[in-house]
């Protein structure tokens, strides 16, 4: 089984490209995913390269930008290529099968969003004497 689920923030704006001859859209970006544990009081993150294909690639490039929170599920894939200097390079990345935009828009300011505050519910007391059971 090869399945990964990640939630993190984009480290820079996604890069949208189209494959020559086929016109298939591909979008590449890096997701910064916080680790569960802190090292010496500092939160650490892993920087995971992601590739998205097709319509999801176009949507990601159009609606997401640096710093936005998103979820990705997909598979881990390793590929190789020959670099300009003649050496063989290996790349490990997540090929996204599903993306979720957890923050929207290219120009909204994420600094004003507080994710640590619980939502307060309006709870109105009910008089139990009117309940028939």
Swiss-Prot record:
SUPFAM superfamilies tied to this protein: Nucleic acid-binding proteins
Annotated GO MF terms: single-stranded DNA binding
Domain SSB stretches: 1-103
Entry-linked InterPro entries: NA-bd_OB-fold, Primosome_PriB/ssb, ssDNA-bd
Entry keyword Membrane: no
Entry's Gene Ontology cellular component terms: nucleoid
Subunit relationships: Homotetramer.
Protein name: Single-stranded DNA-binding protein 2
